[in-house]
Swiss-Prot record:
Keywords: Cytoplasm, Pyridoxine biosynthesis, Transferase. This is Pyridoxine 5'-phosphate synthase. The keyword Aminoacyl-tRNA synthetase does not apply. It is an enzyme of class 2 (transferase). The keyword Cytoplasm applies. It comes from Xanthomonas axonopodis pv. citri (strain 306). It is found in: Cytoplasm. It catalyses: 3-amino-2-oxopropyl phosphate + 1-deoxy-D-xylulose 5-phosphate = pyridoxine 5'-phosphate + phosphate + 2 H2O + H(+).
Length: 255
Protein backbone atom coordinates (compact mmCIF):
# COMPACT_ATOMS: atom_id res chain seq x y z
CA UNK A 1 0.00 0.00 0.00
CA UNK A 2 1.27 3.45 -0.90
CA UNK A 3 1.56 6.07 1.83
CA UNK A 4 -1.23 8.61 1.34
CA UNK A 5 -0.68 12.35 0.85
CA UNK A 6 -2.96 14.82 2.61
CA UNK A 7 -2.23 18.40 1.60
CA UNK A 8 -2.57 21.00 4.35
CA UNK A 9 -4.01 24.16 2.78
CA UNK A 10 -3.57 26.47 5.79
CA UNK A 11 -0.87 28.50 4.03
CA UNK A 12 -3.26 29.32 1.19
CA UNK A 13 -5.59 30.83 3.77
CA UNK A 14 -2.71 32.77 5.37
CA UNK A 15 -1.99 34.44 2.03
CA UNK A 16 -5.67 35.19 1.44
CA UNK A 17 -6.17 36.65 4.89
CA UNK A 18 -3.12 38.89 4.57
CA UNK A 19 -5.13 41.07 2.17
CA UNK A 20 -8.56 40.53 3.63
CA UNK A 21 -10.15 39.42 0.37
CA UNK A 22 -11.10 36.14 -1.26
CA UNK A 23 -7.91 35.41 -3.19
CA UNK A 24 -6.26 33.02 -3.36
CA UNK A 25 -9.31 30.79 -3.14
CA UNK A 26 -8.68 27.97 -0.66
CA UNK A 27 -11.25 25.68 -2.27
CA UNK A 28 -9.83 26.23 -5.75
CA UNK A 29 -6.33 25.46 -4.47
CA UNK A 30 -7.56 22.30 -2.76
CA UNK A 31 -9.32 21.26 -5.95
CA UNK A 32 -6.05 21.67 -7.86
CA UNK A 33 -4.24 19.52 -5.28
CA UNK A 34 -6.83 16.77 -5.65
CA UNK A 35 -6.58 16.94 -9.44
CA UNK A 36 -2.81 16.51 -9.14
CA UNK A 37 -3.20 13.33 -7.12
CA UNK A 38 -3.53 14.31 -3.45
CA UNK A 39 -5.35 11.62 -1.50
CA UNK A 40 -6.82 14.07 0.99
CA UNK A 41 -7.00 17.61 2.31
CA UNK A 42 -5.98 18.73 5.80
CA UNK A 43 -6.96 21.89 7.65
CA UNK A 44 -6.06 23.12 11.13
CA UNK A 45 -8.62 25.75 12.18
CA UNK A 46 -7.50 27.71 15.23
CA UNK A 47 -9.64 29.79 17.60
CA UNK A 48 -8.11 33.06 16.34
CA UNK A 49 -8.91 31.97 12.74
CA UNK A 50 -5.65 33.43 11.54
CA UNK A 51 -5.75 31.17 8.52
CA UNK A 52 -8.49 28.55 8.04
CA UNK A 53 -11.93 29.82 9.08
CA UNK A 54 -15.06 27.91 10.00
CA UNK A 55 -16.63 28.66 6.60
CA UNK A 56 -13.54 27.21 4.89
CA UNK A 57 -14.00 23.98 6.82
CA UNK A 58 -17.58 23.64 5.58
CA UNK A 59 -16.64 24.41 1.97
CA UNK A 60 -13.68 22.02 1.97
CA UNK A 61 -15.79 19.28 3.49
CA UNK A 62 -18.19 19.59 0.57
CA UNK A 63 -15.30 19.56 -1.91
CA UNK A 64 -13.67 16.44 -0.50
CA UNK A 65 -16.98 14.60 -0.45
CA UNK A 66 -17.58 15.61 -4.07
CA UNK A 67 -14.23 14.12 -5.08
CA UNK A 68 -14.26 11.13 -2.75
CA UNK A 69 -11.04 11.98 -0.92
CA UNK A 70 -10.27 12.12 2.78
CA UNK A 71 -10.90 15.23 4.84
CA UNK A 72 -8.65 15.57 7.90
CA UNK A 73 -9.39 18.25 10.49
CA UNK A 74 -6.64 19.03 13.00
CA UNK A 75 -7.10 21.00 16.17
CA UNK A 76 -6.88 21.38 19.90
CA UNK A 77 -9.87 19.60 21.44
CA UNK A 78 -9.50 21.57 24.68
CA UNK A 79 -9.81 25.03 23.05
CA UNK A 80 -13.26 26.46 23.85
CA UNK A 81 -15.54 28.17 21.31
CA UNK A 82 -15.05 31.90 20.91
CA UNK A 83 -16.31 34.53 18.50
CA UNK A 84 -16.82 32.95 15.09
CA UNK A 85 -14.92 29.81 16.09
CA UNK A 86 -17.48 27.19 17.18
CA UNK A 87 -14.95 24.75 18.63
CA UNK A 88 -13.33 21.67 17.11
CA UNK A 89 -16.03 19.22 18.13
CA UNK A 90 -18.81 21.38 16.69
CA UNK A 91 -16.92 21.80 13.40
CA UNK A 92 -16.55 18.04 13.20
CA UNK A 93 -20.22 17.50 14.01
CA UNK A 94 -21.08 19.76 11.08
CA UNK A 95 -18.71 18.05 8.63
CA UNK A 96 -18.05 14.51 9.94
CA UNK A 97 -14.54 14.27 8.52
CA UNK A 98 -12.94 10.93 7.79
CA UNK A 99 -10.14 11.78 10.21
CA UNK A 100 -9.72 14.09 13.19
CA UNK A 101 -6.17 14.77 14.37
CA UNK A 102 -6.01 16.08 17.91
CA UNK A 103 -3.14 18.48 18.61
CA UNK A 104 -2.23 20.12 21.96
CA UNK A 105 -1.35 23.54 20.58
CA UNK A 106 -1.95 26.76 22.50
CA UNK A 107 -3.15 30.12 21.20
CA UNK A 108 0.32 31.65 21.34
CA UNK A 109 2.02 29.00 19.23
CA UNK A 110 3.08 29.98 15.73
CA UNK A 111 2.70 26.35 14.69
CA UNK A 112 2.27 22.95 16.33
CA UNK A 113 5.57 22.07 17.98
CA UNK A 114 4.93 19.21 20.41
CA UNK A 115 2.71 16.23 20.97
CA UNK A 116 0.48 15.15 23.83
CA UNK A 117 1.88 14.34 27.25
CA UNK A 118 -0.19 11.33 28.19
CA UNK A 119 0.57 11.86 31.87
CA UNK A 120 -1.88 14.79 31.81
CA UNK A 121 -5.54 15.24 30.83
CA UNK A 122 -5.97 11.56 30.00
CA UNK A 123 -9.53 11.25 31.30
CA UNK A 124 -10.76 14.31 29.41
CA UNK A 125 -8.83 13.29 26.30
CA UNK A 126 -10.36 9.81 26.35
CA UNK A 127 -13.85 11.31 26.62
CA UNK A 128 -13.19 13.61 23.67
CA UNK A 129 -11.79 10.78 21.56
CA UNK A 130 -15.02 8.87 22.20
CA UNK A 131 -17.06 11.91 21.15
CA UNK A 132 -15.17 12.27 17.86
CA UNK A 133 -15.41 8.56 17.11
CA UNK A 134 -19.18 8.71 17.59
CA UNK A 135 -19.23 10.98 14.55
CA UNK A 136 -17.71 8.17 12.49
CA UNK A 137 -14.30 9.82 12.35
CA UNK A 138 -10.98 8.06 12.73
CA UNK A 139 -9.01 9.73 15.53
CA UNK A 140 -5.27 10.38 15.43
CA UNK A 141 -3.19 11.92 18.23
CA UNK A 142 -0.18 14.19 17.59
CA UNK A 143 2.81 12.73 19.46
CA UNK A 144 6.55 13.20 19.86
CA UNK A 145 8.69 10.30 18.69
CA UNK A 146 10.50 10.25 22.02
CA UNK A 147 7.31 9.88 24.06
CA UNK A 148 7.75 6.68 26.11
CA UNK A 149 3.97 6.29 26.47
CA UNK A 150 2.95 6.15 22.80
CA UNK A 151 1.06 2.91 23.41
CA UNK A 152 -1.27 4.79 25.76
CA UNK A 153 -2.83 6.44 22.71
CA UNK A 154 -4.45 3.08 21.98
CA UNK A 155 -5.64 2.74 25.58
CA UNK A 156 -7.30 6.15 25.30
CA UNK A 157 -9.19 4.96 22.22
CA UNK A 158 -7.21 6.55 19.38
CA UNK A 159 -6.95 4.78 16.04
CA UNK A 160 -3.68 6.34 14.92
CA UNK A 161 -0.87 8.61 15.99
CA UNK A 162 0.71 11.37 13.96
CA UNK A 163 4.45 11.55 14.56
CA UNK A 164 5.62 15.16 14.92
CA UNK A 165 8.46 15.21 12.37
CA UNK A 166 9.85 18.69 13.00
CA UNK A 167 12.91 17.36 14.88
CA UNK A 168 13.63 14.90 12.05
CA UNK A 169 13.46 17.66 9.43
CA UNK A 170 15.87 19.78 11.46
CA UNK A 171 18.27 16.85 11.88
CA UNK A 172 18.08 16.02 8.18
CA UNK A 173 18.90 19.60 7.21
CA UNK A 174 21.95 19.56 9.48
CA UNK A 175 23.25 16.24 8.17
CA UNK A 176 22.37 14.30 11.32
CA UNK A 177 19.36 12.33 10.15
CA UNK A 178 20.47 8.83 11.17
CA UNK A 179 19.98 9.26 14.92
CA UNK A 180 16.61 10.92 14.41
CA UNK A 181 15.46 8.21 12.01
CA UNK A 182 16.33 5.52 14.55
CA UNK A 183 14.17 7.31 17.13
CA UNK A 184 11.25 7.63 14.72
CA UNK A 185 11.54 4.02 13.55
CA UNK A 186 11.40 2.87 17.17
CA UNK A 187 8.35 5.05 17.81
CA UNK A 188 6.59 3.60 14.77
CA UNK A 189 7.36 0.07 15.90
CA UNK A 190 5.98 0.76 19.37
CA UNK A 191 2.84 2.30 17.91
CA UNK A 192 2.31 -0.60 15.54
CA UNK A 193 2.78 -3.11 18.36
CA UNK A 194 0.00 -1.32 20.25
CA UNK A 195 -2.33 -1.63 17.26
CA UNK A 196 -2.08 2.00 16.21
CA UNK A 197 -1.87 3.24 12.63
CA UNK A 198 0.94 5.69 11.89
CA UNK A 199 0.70 9.11 10.28
CA UNK A 200 3.47 11.71 10.11
CA UNK A 201 3.70 15.43 9.56
CA UNK A 202 5.44 18.75 10.12
CA UNK A 203 8.29 20.12 8.00
CA UNK A 204 8.37 17.10 5.71
CA UNK A 205 9.56 18.18 2.26
CA UNK A 206 10.63 16.84 -1.10
CA UNK A 207 14.19 16.85 0.22
CA UNK A 208 13.59 14.71 3.30
CA UNK A 209 10.41 12.68 2.76
CA UNK A 210 11.98 9.79 0.85
CA UNK A 211 14.62 9.13 3.50
CA UNK A 212 11.98 9.24 6.22
CA UNK A 213 9.70 6.71 4.55
CA UNK A 214 12.62 4.41 3.75
CA UNK A 215 13.60 4.23 7.41
CA UNK A 216 10.31 4.45 9.31
CA UNK A 217 8.03 1.43 8.89
CA UNK A 218 4.31 1.48 8.31
CA UNK A 219 3.59 5.17 7.64
CA UNK A 220 0.04 5.25 6.30
CA UNK A 221 -0.33 8.97 5.66
CA UNK A 222 1.72 12.16 5.60
CA UNK A 223 0.23 15.62 6.04
CA UNK A 224 2.28 18.27 4.25
CA UNK A 225 1.53 21.95 3.84
CA UNK A 226 4.22 24.56 4.45
CA UNK A 227 6.95 22.91 2.38
CA UNK A 228 4.58 21.89 -0.41
CA UNK A 229 3.19 25.40 -0.80
CA UNK A 230 6.69 26.91 -0.56
CA UNK A 231 7.96 24.58 -3.29
CA UNK A 232 4.88 25.40 -5.36
CA UNK A 233 6.07 29.01 -5.60
CA UNK A 234 8.93 27.75 -7.77
CA UNK A 235 7.45 24.62 -9.32
CA UNK A 236 3.74 25.36 -9.55
CA UNK A 237 1.09 23.78 -7.34
CA UNK A 238 0.29 20.91 -9.68
CA UNK A 239 3.96 19.99 -10.11
CA UNK A 240 4.65 20.24 -6.39
CA UNK A 241 1.82 17.86 -5.48
CA UNK A 242 2.83 15.44 -8.24
CA UNK A 243 6.42 15.44 -6.98
CA UNK A 244 5.22 14.28 -3.56
CA UNK A 245 2.96 11.64 -5.07
CA UNK A 246 5.94 10.33 -7.07
CA UNK A 247 8.04 10.09 -3.89
CA UNK A 248 5.26 8.15 -2.18
CA UNK A 249 4.80 5.82 -5.14
CA UNK A 250 8.50 5.00 -5.16
CA UNK A 251 8.11 3.34 -1.78
CA UNK A 252 5.49 1.29 0.00
CA UNK A 253 4.17 0.80 3.49
CA UNK A 254 6.20 -1.92 5.17
CA UNK A 255 5.24 -3.46 8.48
Amino acid sequence: MTTQLSVNVNKIAVLRNSRGGADPDVVQAARACIAAGAHGITVHPRPDQRHIRADDVLALSALTREHGVEFNIEGNPFAPPRGDYPGLLQLCRATRPEQVTLVPDGDGQLTSDHGFDFAQDTVQLAELITAFKRLGSRVSLFVDAGNPDIARAATLGADRIELYTGPYAHAHASGQADTALALFANAAQRASAAGLGINAGHDLSQANLGDFLAAVPGVLEVSIGHALISEALYQGLDASVRAYVDILRSGHVSA
